[in-house]
Amino acid sequence: MSLPDKAFPVSWDQFHRDARALAWRIAGLDREWRAIVAITRGGLVPAAIICRELGIRLIETVCIASYHDYTSQGEMQVLKGIGASLLENQGEGVIVVDDLTDTGKTAAIVREMMPRAHFATVYAKPKGRPLIDTLRHGGLTGYLDLFPMGYGLHLSGADCWRKTRLNETK
């Protein structure tokens, strides 16, 4: 699939810079963090970068499947939950990290599990923005048509871009 005129391709270098900038914003909050929870799979890379920048050693994952056919969000399904020790105190002192908050459905499910956790994402669309505490880029309306899955890199060499709907108001 070729990129449309309004594509927002993200290189690994740009993504790394944006994730580091997100880490610096979180560092500016001057809080003690006990762990990071990465929303898989997209949150794994920014979580690793943020952990490194902030000196956090405990990393957990939560896996929620939503893009079953890689083109549109389907029914949400929790494939792997969060360990009990991080759920204590409703997630206080935990940073939840994802690469992109699209509709906010995934963040809402994790927010129910950890209402006092701090939610951070590298990129956010307007619909998902209210669920995020700290982000690098928000309000991606108007120029983000496609978001890279694997950031445009795939072992087969194929283009891997997930179509996303910009002006969804439902």
UniProtKB/Swiss-Prot annotation:
Its cofactor is Mg(2+). GO terms for biological process: GMP salvage; purine ribonucleoside salvage; XMP salvage. Coiled coil: none annotated. Pathway: Purine metabolism; GMP biosynthesis via salvage pathway; GMP from guanine: step 1/1; Purine metabolism; XMP biosynthesis via salvage pathway; XMP from xanthine: step 1/1. Its EC number is 2.4.2.-, 2.4.2.22. GO terms for cellular component: plasma membrane. 5-phospho-alpha-D-ribose 1-diphosphate binds at R41, G42, D98, D99, L100, T101, D102, T103, G104, K105, T106. It is found in: Cell inner membrane. It is an enzyme of class 2 (transferase). Mg(2+) binds at D99. GMP binds at D102, T103, G104, K105, T106. Homotetramer. PANTHER family: XANTHINE PHOSPHORIBOSYLTRANSFERASE, XANTHINE-GUANINE PHOSPHORIBOSYLTRANSFERASE. Belongs to the purine/pyrimidine phosphoribosyltransferase family. XGPT subfamily. This is Xanthine-guanine phosphoribosyltransferase. It comes from Brucella abortus (strain 2308). The gene is gpt.
